[in-house]
């Protein structure tokens, strides 16, 4: 069926016949298919040299939003292929990676203009082979973890610390005290993990075998 689609400011404004809007650019798409934009849930483009902060078992305090490169030609290629939105993820060198960036691709814009505002919060985790291969062998003989049991212990230790940190802040806030000098020390790493415990941040996790998936859940 022959139909017009009116697009304003990057969004569909109307669908119908014989639509017009002053000086709008007209694209004749007869014989072609029009589909919704593709959402890429797992992407590493536009963050060259900023993917992995793998020096520690956890880098939950860092965010991919700080290293988005709006001049990466892959943005243009993604748009040409129909990708409109992506989740840009930290790498998988450590069990607990950095915070993700949710972006809507626009060519020729500043990095800040690509970031979704008030979007759901995400963070990158990794299990099994990703972490083990980053740490394994003679190059890193003393790096922890090097096994699946070590990866599991990392999550146990960090979430226990995050639970204690979150409880300390909740007790302080409930006390009604206004003296910030007596407040718990702010820790962005544990604060991020506490958001997961409070269902305010979601995990995107590289996974391999059933046992470790069940472990994380």
What does each model-identified segment do?
Residues 29-101, 109:
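Metal-associated gating/positioning segment near the N- to mid-region
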Residues 13, 19, 45, 93-94, ...:
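Glycine-rich nucleotide phosphate-binding loop and flanking beta-alpha elements
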Residues 4-6, 39, 84, 144:
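A fold-wide structural signal in alpha/beta-hydrolase
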Residues 24-25, 60, 201:
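A structural micro-motif
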Residues 79-217:
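Polyanionic/metal-chelating signatures
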Residues 1-35:
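Histidine-rich, glycine-flanked metal-binding segment
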């Amino acid at each position: 069926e022959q139909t017009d689609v009116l697009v304003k400011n990057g969004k569909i404004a109307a669908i119908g016949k014989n639509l017009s809007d002053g000086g709008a650019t007209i694209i004749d798409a007869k014989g072609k298919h029009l589909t919704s934009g593709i959402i890429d849930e797992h992407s590493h483009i536009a963050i060259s040299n900023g993917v992995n902060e793998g020096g520690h078992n956890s880098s939950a305090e860092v965010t991919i939003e700080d290293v988005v490169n709006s001049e990466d030609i892959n943005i243009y290629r993604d748009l040409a292929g129909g990708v409109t939105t992506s989740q840009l993820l930290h790498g998988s060198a450590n069990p607990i990676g950095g915070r993700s960036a949710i972006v809507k691709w626009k060519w020729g814009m500043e990095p800040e203009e690509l970031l979704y505002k008030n979007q759901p919060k995400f963070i990158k985790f990794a299990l099994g082979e990703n972490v083990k291969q980053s740490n394994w062998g003679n190059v890193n003989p003393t790096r922890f973890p090097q096994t699946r049991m070590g990866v599991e212990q990392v999550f146990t230790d960090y979430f226990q610390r995050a639970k204690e940190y979150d409880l300390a802040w909740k007790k302080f806030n409930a006390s009604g005290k206004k003296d910030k000098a007596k407040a718990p020390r702010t820790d962005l790493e544990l604060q991020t993990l506490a958001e997961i415990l409070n269902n305010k941040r979601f995990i995107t996790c590289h996974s391999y075998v059933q046992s470790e998936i069940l472990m994380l859940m």
